[in-house]
Amino acid sequence: MGGKDFQIYMDYHEKSGTGAKSPDNIEADTKSRRKTSKTEWSLFPGFYDRIVSVFGLPEIDLFVSRTSAKCQRYVSWDSDPEAFAIDAFTLYWKLFFFDVFLPFAILPKVLQKIAYDKAIGFLVVPYWKTQSWYPLFTSLLTKVLIVLRPHTNMLNCSDRVHPMGSSLNLVAGILSGTPS
């Protein structure tokens, strides 16, 4: 069906009302409303518990969804009626002891926000010493790092395991934007 034929088809069905209406098309309607992230990786609870046993329980979880939040209070990426707020970058982080485990691509922005807000919390990041953000990460550290050795089940997203889980070294540290 070419472009013109498709447009004629669509015009006909819109005018005649023969397209499937939402109540009649339950499967498509349900799938279109479901919010699932295929990229929101989360630490397996045992690894997270190890970090919390050393650093303490955070007050708020930043950059998560309802399904991946580890704290009762969390800040979501997207509209969520149960979230404390949407978009963690709009908050003043100094008010909370937070935890962050996020897409690695925004680590530089997160580290700058910690420094700017003079905030304190813990981050879990890849042990990538050659990355441009790593010196800033180490300059904000207040305690020794917790090293999380590679493990197949270390990172999960719904029922999937991360393809790099068995080879990725992660580190966790408390960071503070207040100079010591």
What would you call each of these model-derived segments?
Residues 148-165:
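Active-site capping/gating segments
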